[in-house]
């Protein structure tokens, strides 16, 4: 394939309404997460959890300190910005967010993410946002931080096609950042041709398939709402408002289990 993936980046840029120069593609979002963490070499990283365990596994390989900020169940796993900012240690230099989050299916709205990026920018904290599930959100524009990457250079948004496009075997992910210096560092350390030609070809077709995108979103949003309301009406369960394609449920009846 084209070593620079010029055509693919152009298609992604049109899909995300962003400059192709801000895009890096990789062998799944996992490769890009690993690259970002290894290149940032964070002395102290903060992970908002509970969340995907791969972040901490990659962080452990760099030898830095890993800290956690846990979302609170009594707030329905929605982030309390005031408490979050107050509890953040001064020496944190990398913040990792999954948005919408796995496994809580909660989400940080774009307006709150802007406050987070401003707060972090003032403290030289780089932010990684994993948006693997964002295309399932009821309103993508309300959640995605891609529009903020032009304004802030202390952030990289990472996405993949495994979930929304049901194509985990392609191993295709992409990242977006306006930090050209960091982007160059990623490209220098990334293996050449890390994305195979089949994935590059399929990626271009995926992002242009408006029919699939609309049909899938309509189905997921409709079924999610139906399931959420049904579970809410069951006294033995408590469901938390979902933004992804899954619902976190607490079992309230002691005699019941998840099996």
Give each language-model segment a name.
Residues 1-11, 27, 100, 195:
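A structural motif shared across PLP-dependent enzymes of the aminotransferase-like
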Residues 4, 154-233, 237-240:
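PLP-dependent aminotransferase class I/II
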């Amino acid at each position: 394939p084209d070593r620079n993936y010029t055509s693919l980046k152009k298609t992604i840029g049109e899909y995300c309404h962003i400059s192709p120069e801000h895009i890096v593609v990789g062998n799944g979002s996992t490769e890009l997460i690993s690259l970002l963490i290894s290149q940032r070499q964070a002395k102290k990283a903060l992970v908002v959890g509970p969340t995907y365990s791969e972040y901490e596994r990659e962080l452990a390989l760099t030898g830095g300190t890993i800290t956690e900020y846990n979302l609170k169940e009594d707030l329905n796993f929605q982030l309390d910005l005031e408490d979050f900012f107050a509890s953040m240690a001064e020496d944190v230099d990398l913040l990792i967010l999954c948005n919408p989050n796995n496994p809580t299916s909660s989400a940080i709205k774009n307006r709150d993410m802007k406050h987070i990026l401003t707060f972090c920018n003032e403290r030289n904290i780089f932010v990684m946002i994993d948006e693997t599930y964002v295309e399932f959100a009821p309103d993508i524009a309300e959640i995605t931080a891609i529009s903020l990457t032009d304004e802030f250079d202390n952030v990289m948004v990472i996405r993949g096609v495994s979930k929304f496009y049901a194509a985990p075997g392609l191993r295709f992910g992409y990242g977006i950042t306006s930090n050209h210096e960091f982007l160059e560092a990623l490209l220098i350390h990334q293996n050449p041709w890390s994305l195979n030609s089949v994935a590059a070809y399929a990626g271009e077709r995926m992002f242009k398939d408006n029919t699939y995108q609309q049909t899938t979103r309509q189905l997921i949003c409709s079924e999610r709402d139906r399931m959420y309301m049904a579970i809410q009406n069951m006294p033995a369960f408590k469901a938390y408002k979902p933004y992804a394609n899954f619902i976190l449920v607490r079992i309230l009846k002691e005699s019941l289990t998840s099996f």
